[in-house]
Design a protein with these regions (language model features):
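Positively charged n-region of N-terminal signal peptides that target proteins for export
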Residues: 1-4
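Generic N-terminal simple sequence motifs
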Residues: 18-20, 44, 177
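Acidic, aliphatic-rich amphipathic alpha-helical segments
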Residues: 66-68
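Short, structured beta-strand/loop micro-motifs enriched in basic residues and often containing a Trp
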Residues: 74-86
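Bacterial Sec-dependent signal peptides at the C-terminal "C-region" and cleavage site
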Residues: 18-30
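Bacterial N-terminal signal peptides
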Residues: 9-20
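Sequence context surrounding c-type heme c attachment/ligation sites in exported
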Residues: 27-31, 37-40, 47-55, 59-64, ...
Length: 204
């Protein structure tokens, strides 16, 4: 009888512990635990929702790589990269396979709190883009995705201007490292600037 009560007590304790265990939360990492790209069945990208926990690279204000209409308001661009790729860049001066660079666009504000001049970033996200390096998957090794909902990144056609622009002007491996102040010196030290970028700089 005593043994039966012990078994029942152990069973109840196990049940309580199981119910108290935290529910696993959704993660943007893949099954291996790395921040590598994960794709949907139709070839799009599962947007890395926790990208703001990645490495911050740079910000720009009202940047444009060609003539465009005045939007009537200012915009901030923030760039983040997955930690694995960042660490590899520091060692080699270039991006490894499975690199993901996220460009986040936010509205700029000028009137708020005690601010009297200049601009600050608002909470309104206007757009998200992801530049993915997947050598086995994409022609040219890189691809662009855009995400309106922050859930799915839609693959952009290789015919779009962003591909040729990055190939012709990117300082390192089709990426605009020339605008990443903490990485520009690394690329210079490792001698990884593209021929196109060096030619462009020499012509200034």
């Amino acid at each position: 009888m005593k043994r039966a009560w012990i078994l029942i007590s152990l069973w109840v304790l196990a049940l309580v512990l199981a119910l108290a265990a935290p529910t696993p939360q959704a993660s943007t990492t893949n099954e291996s635990g790395s921040n590598s790209p994960v794709y949907t069945a139709d070839g799009n990208l599962k947007f890395p929702a926790q990208y703001r926990e990645w490495i911050y690279v740079t910000s720009g204000v009202d940047m444009s790589y060609g003539p465009g209409a005045n939007m009537g308001h200012s915009m901030f661009d923030n760039v983040f990269v997955n930690p694995e790729a960042y660490k590899a860049f520091l060692q080699t001066g270039t991006w490894p396979d499975k690199t993901m660079l996220v460009l986040e666009e936010r509205m700029a504000g000028s009137k708020g709190s005690i601010n009297k001049n200049g601009h600050f970033q608002t909470g309104e996200v206007m757009g998200r883009e992801v530049h993915v390096k997947d050598e086995a998957r994409f022609k040219g090794k890189w691809a662009f995705f855009t995400s309106d909902d922050g859930v799915t990144g839609k693959l952009l056609s290789q015919e779009m201007d962003c591909y040729s622009c990055h190939a012709q002007h990117g300082a390192v491996d089709t990426t605009f490292v020339q605008f990443y102040p903490t990485l520009l010196g690394v690329a210079k030290k490792k001698n990884t600037f593209s021929a196109a970028y060096l030619k462009e700089e020499a012509g200034k």
